[in-house]
Amino acid sequence: GVLSLLKKLPMILKHLHGK
């Protein structure tokens, strides 16, 4: 659900900034 997406957002942002 939305909560799952919100929890994944920080990880995705870290992955993008990790580049």
Swiss-Prot record:
Tissue and organ expression note: Expressed by the venom gland.
Phylogenetic lineage: Eukaryota, Metazoa, Ecdysozoa, Arthropoda, Hexapoda
Role played: Antimicrobial and mast cell degranulating peptide which probably acts by forming pores in membranes. Active against both Gram-negative and Gram-positive bacterial strains as well as against yeasts. Has little hemolytic activity. In the context of inflammation and cancer tests, is weakly cytotoxic to normal cells, induces calcium signaling but does not impact cAMP production. In addition, prevents LPS-induced nitric oxid (NO) synthesis but does not affect the IP3 signaling and pro-inflammatory activation of endothelial cells.
Name assigned to this protein: Antimicrobial peptide Xac-3
Cysteine disulfide links: none
GO cellular component, one term: other organism cell membrane
Domain of life: Eukaryota
Similarity remark: Belongs to the xylopin-like family.
Cellular localization per UniProt: Secreted; Target cell membrane
Record organism: Xylocopa violacea (Violet carpenter bee)
GO annotation, biological process: defense response to bacterium; defense response to fungus; innate immune response; killing of cells of another organism
Keywords associated with the record: Antibiotic, Antimicrobial, Fungicide, Immunity, Innate immunity, Membrane, Secreted, Target cell membrane, Target membrane
